[in-house]
Amino acid sequence: ASDVYKRQLPDANNHLVELLEREGAEAVVPDLMDFMFYCFYNQLYKADNLGTSKKSAKISKMGIKIIERLRKPAAEAFAKSKHFIPPADIEETARNASEIVSIGNQTGEGWFLTGEMLELLHTDTPNIVCTQPFGCLPNHVVGKGVIKELRKRHPEANIVAIDYDPGASEVNQLNRIKLMLSTAQKNLSKK
């Protein structure tokens, strides 16, 4: 879970997925398509609560339905599989996130970052690296700011927030990630 740029671009996150896999972890990267749903869904909230264009909300709702229809065959196949998890439903993600942060929180990754972390926790992925772009206050609020509440609601949550910026120490990032992985191993051996 993280800032979409830091999550999706290996050069922006010091090749985090490769690092996790080299350390023996299975990396689960939230779907980029879900970020598009988040952008569309925000328009629905704005029209209902902030007085923005109903036409924009209608187009966004149509966008959600079209993309859902296009990915429906894959979602159904994932649901039947033992090895894959079907894509999240944006309304469920929003409903889950709204228990912790307001859906009106739309700056940066907004409420969606919290929703993604909850989705990972609900799909038995308790070990989360929350990548943070340096100086992005909205991401720090909805990333680092909700970790305590997530741990309270999900004691199995093993979440580490990592700042990625040109001046950040790669060694510090690596040490914090390895500490999270060490905790994950200890928790796994308890099961």
Each model region followed by its residue ranges:
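Hydrophobic alpha/beta core scaffold segments
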Residues: 10-24, 90-190
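Redox- and metal-dependent alpha/beta enzyme cores, enriched for Fe-S-associated oxidoreductases
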Residues: 11-116
